[in-house]
From Swiss-Prot:
The gene is ssuB. Keywords: ATP-binding, Cell inner membrane, Cell membrane, Membrane, Nucleotide-binding, Translocase, Transport. Part of the ABC transporter complex SsuABC involved in aliphatic sulfonates import. Responsible for energy coupling to the transport system. InterPro entries: AAA+_ATPase, ABC_transporter-like_ATP-bd, ABC_transporter-like_CS, ABC_transporter_ATP-bind, P-loop_NTPase. It comes from the Bacteria. PANTHER family: ALIPHATIC SULFONATES IMPORT ATP-BINDING PROTEIN SSUB (PTHR42788:SF17), TAURINE IMPORT ATP-BINDING PROTEIN-RELATED (PTHR42788). ATP binds at residues 72-79. Residues 40-260 form the ABC transporter domain. It catalyses: ATP + H2O + aliphatic sulfonate-[sulfonate-binding protein]Side 1 = ADP + phosphate + aliphatic sulfonateSide 2 + [sulfonate-binding protein]Side 1. The complex is composed of two ATP-binding proteins (SsuB), two transmembrane proteins (SsuC) and a solute-binding protein (SsuA). It comes from Cupriavidus metallidurans (strain ATCC 43123 / DSM 2839 / NBRC 102507 / CH34). This is Aliphatic sulfonates import ATP-binding protein SsuB. It is a peripheral membrane protein.
């Protein structure tokens, strides 16, 4: 995902803030959802841009509290699908339903992007508390504590590292008690160590709070570390739905983890089998030798 211009970033943050205020004005609707995850049903969804079909009759389901990761090559349609689930765009055919009700932009859904979209003129705690009535600001402080930033509450966003900014964005999403959290490559701009730390934090909060999660990522290892299922989209179609039954927390160095990662990676890279891959490698080596 491309980084946005500072002015555009501020505008997007302002939009997020106003959406949060709108949702905060609907306490009855929010309370009616209860707690825990929400069921997601994507049925025969089609999406076109300028006459070109980018999603072809996609079907996807997530049970309440399930963590589903979507992987695939750039341009395959995975972020488009997430935007449709978020209600940021409309499908040309098919339907998205949450707990059996038509999707839209309900207060039970929050999105976390690669860009934290923090308001630069508000301190960290105030960024988390956007849209909350003053009596709920203690909730914002509690979420900051849960993401490990209680001591940075009065800092300006500009003084935070990239990983810290994403922790604030995560707290801001979760303070509204979403039943569905949509993660659009939220860790893509972070260094490897910070990324692993954030993965552990997201998993910990997901297990504690019980929301349904839908993650879009290019990182197959990240998908397997976090998800109950890894879904592969190729050319606008779901071509793999891989269960991940490994015990949590996941250990990347194990043979079982590596086997699932290899299975998904080979599908992403469109390699049919280890034998086919080895044969291709030997063929290329022979070509290089003869050249």
């Amino acid at each position: 995902m491309m980084h946005t211009h500072p002015v555009e970033q501020a505008a997007l943050a302002w939009l997020d803030a106003n959406l949060a205020r709108r949702d905060a004005a609907r306490p009855a609707a929010r309370a009616s959802h209860g707690v825990g995850g929400i069921a997601l049903h994507v049925e025969q969804v089609v999406k076109r841009y300028n006459g070109r079909e980018v999603l072809h009759g996609v079907n996807l389901r997530a049970a309440p509290g399930e963590f589903v990761a979507i992987v695939g090559r750039s341009g395959c349609g995975k972020s488009t699908l997430l935007r449709l689930v978020a209600g940021l765009e409309s499908a040309d055919a098919g339907a998205v339903a949450l707990d059996g009700q038509p999707g839209g932009t309900p207060s039970s859904v929050r999105v976390m992007f690669q860009d934290a979209r923090l308001l630069p003129w508000k301190r960290v705690l105030d960024n988390v508390a956007i849209g909350l009535p003053r009596e709920r600001h203690a909730d914002a402080a509690a979420l900051l504590d849960q993401v490990g930033l209680a001591d940075r509450a009065n800092e300006w966003p500009a003084r935070l590292s990239g990983g810290q900014r994403q922790r604030v964005a995560l707290a801001r999403a979760l303070v509204h008690h979403p039943r569905l959290l949509l993660l659009d490559e939220p860790l893509g701009a972070l260094d490897a160590l910070t990324r692993i730390e954030m993965q552990a934090l997201i998993e910990s909060l997901w297990r504690r709070l019980g929301f349904t999660a839908l993650l879009v990522t290019h990182d197959v290892s990240e998908a397997i570390a976090l998800a109950d299922r890894v879904v592969l989209i190729e050319d606008g179609r779901i071509t793999l739905d891989q269960q991940v039954t490994l015990a949590r927390p996941r250990q990347r160095g194990t043979a079982d983890f590596a086997q699932i990662e290899d299975t998904v990676l080979r599908r992403v890279m469109r390699q049919e089998s280890p034998a086919a891959s080895d044969a291709e490698l030997h063929f290329r080596s022979a070509e290089e030798f003869l050249s």
